[in-house]
Design a protein with these regions (language model features):
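Hinge/cleft segment of the Venus flytrap/periplasmic-binding protein
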Residues: 44-78, 216, 332, 336-496
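Hydrophobic alpha-helical
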Residues: 123, 137-156, 231-232, 246-312, ...
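Extracytoplasmic "Venus flytrap"
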Residues: 50-71, 78-99, 112-124, 132, ...
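Short beta-strand elements in bilobed, periplasmic/extracellular small-molecule ligand-binding domains
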Residues: 105-116, 212-213, 238-254
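Flexible loop/hinge segments that line or gate small-molecule binding clefts
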Residues: 147-190, 306-312
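Short, solvent-exposed amphipathic alpha-helices that sit
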Residues: 92-106, 191-195, 223-242, 256, ...
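Hydrophobic alpha-helical segments within soluble ligand-binding/sensing domains
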Residues: 181-211, 257-258, 305-309, 325-344
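N-terminal secretory signal peptides
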Residues: 1-14, 24, 28-29, 35-42
Length: 496
């Protein structure tokens, strides 16, 4: 490969520069401070529940009926699509934004994007986008406090709504009417268990037991926080000699991760391995450890498969990360919403919670050996994707002003395929070479261990009770703690 063709490492400064440019651009292009139908944001919980809350589809006949009843556009119509995110200071958030813009433009829609940091900004931004013609909105990590009101706004204006990391045991799509239709969130226990098994196996082989454990957040995307901590519990059961230490929250980002790392260094410095809740906060914590002379990079694992982490993996400075093909994960929601807008599809009740499949990325050779010796290779959820090829063909585009990821999201739209004579492709043209499993998704309610959406709800509710703060140091203590778990809290390492 020529020198000019080699992937260039993106610096933290470049990432934040991109985020700032993106934020400035979207602010200028999308926010018009106009309100649609007036909404009383101080209404009681009872008042906030839309009149259409009972509209759900449980059969194919009801699916077709609701698709036609709720449609708000005609096939081929050019309407607005709005994306609101809680920040753009993380590679995941930027790639999610970029891929939704790409998908919207491929489908011939007017893309609008914005950052919202307060409850009022979430509400006002949604209203502004609807006033500008948005017929579908997507929210990345919305605060749960605004969901009843946002659903009411969308219900009153016949606008479809989807989310990433937008549910808890108390709040699900469909709870506030028929227009919050989908939440797309990986089951992060499935994304934690395999890479952590690999890390603990490597630590065992090297006589290491002191594992620095960083959690995610008690306030943002808590559904992922609790899933991740469940995955930690699942892996730990196979390596009871490990001591989990630190337990700080990295708040999903580089700066939060660095603060968490500094807090742990104030307690001790003899850490021998590191599990972080996602790549961004883990990289931040590693920077603090390195500055303090604690170099445990090759004994580090996390989840997301962001560019800078993947580059460190190939350099031997990071063991493994588990990815959900972020650009595919982000972009695929757009054609699904388009199909709902034009009446081509509507989810059944148990299809409203969705999750992406997952792949692990590490150094070729090492990750396979660890998978064999740990036994994780026998788990159907375990899959290995090519790290170098992902960098060169997908992740490197993250640095571009307006990237074109290797997907044609029209192929995921039932309506667009019919309109244009295309063949439907669940992988959106991305194939399975770069992402053997993660160019795909599934419905958690249909997993064997759940079997219904209500079982998923009870599971997530129990996880929020027992795993929002998992600050246990020894496996003996964890075993004792687990005696409290109710039967609805599923600890089986089976996602089939």
């Amino acid at each position: 490969m020529k020198e000019d063709d080699k992937p260039k490492k993106i610096t933290r400064r470049q990432a934040f520069k991109m985020a700032g440019a993106a934020a400035a651009g979207i602010a200028a292009s999308s926010l018009v401070r106009r309100f649609v139908k007036p909404v009383n944001i101080f209404a009681s919980t009872k008042e906030k529940e839309p009149a259409g809350a009972a509209l759900v589809a449980t059969t194919e006949a009801e699916r077709k009926e609701l698709a036609q009843k709720l449609k708000n556009a005609k096939p081929g119509e050019k309407f607005g699509f709005g994306h609101i995110t809680w920040h753009l200071a993380q590679e995941y958030a930027i790639m999610n934004y970029q891929s939704q813009q790409q998908a919207a433009e491929q489908l011939g829609l007017n893309f609008m994007g914005a950052v919202a940091t307060t409850d009022s900004e979430w509400l006002e931004t949604a209203e502004s986008m609807i006033a500008k013609g948005a017929k579908a909105l997507h929210l990345n990590v919305p605060p749960m406090s605004v969901m009843p009101e946002l659903c009411r706004i969308c219900d009153e204006n016949n606008v479809f709504l989807s989310t990433n990391f937008g549910y808890t045991g108390d709040v699900f799509p469909g709870d506030y009417g028929p227009r919050w239709v989908v939440d797309n969130t990986p089951l992060s226990a499935e994304q934690t268990y395999p890479p952590l098994m690999l890390l603990m196996e490597k630590m065992r082989q090297n006589g290491r037991t002191k594992l620095l454990h960083h959690q995610a957040s008690k306030t943002a995307a808590t559904v992922s926080t609790v899933y991740i901590n469940l995955g930690v519990f699942m892996a730990w059961k196979n390596y009871p000699e490990m001591h989990l230490l630190g337990h700080q929250y990295g708040e999903w980002g580089y700066e939060g991760g660095r603060k968490a790392g500094e807090a742990c260094l104030a307690e001790r410095t003899d850490y021998e391995g590191f599990w972080g809740a996602n790549d961004s906060q883990t990289k931040g914590a590693l920077s603090a450890l390195i500055d303090a002379g604690v170099n445990i990079g090759p004994f580090t694992a996390s989840r997301d498969m962001e560019l800078t982490t993947a580059q460190d993996v190939l350099k031997g400075e990071f063991l493994v990360t588990s990815g959900f093909a972020i650009p595919y994960f982000g972009g695929r929601t757009v054609p699904m919403l388009y199909d709902m807008c034009v009446g081509a599809w509507y989810p059944l009740r148990d299809e409203m919670i969705q999750a992406g499949r997952l792949d692990c990325y590490g150094r070729p050779g090492e990750i396979e050996r660890l998978a064999e010796s740990s036994g994780i290779i026998k788990n159907p959820s375990f899959s290995i994707g090519p790290t170098k090829e992902n960098i060169e063909k997908i992740l490197i585009h993250f640095k571009e002003d307006k990237p074109e990821y290797p997907y044609d999201f029209r192929l995921l739209s039932l309506s667009k395929c019919e309109e244009l004579g295309l063949k439907y492709d669940r992988h959106a043209g991305g194939g399975t070479e770069l992402a053997p499993l993660s160019h795909n998704y599934y419905f958690p309610s249909k997993l064997r261990k759940f079997g219904s959406l209500e079982a998923v709800r009870k599971h997530v509710g129990a996880l929020h009770k027992y795993f929002l703060d998992f600050n246990i140091d020894t496996w003996e203590e964890a075993e004792e703690y687990a005696k409290q778990f109710p039967p609805e809290l599923k600890t089986e390492t089976d996602w089939q």
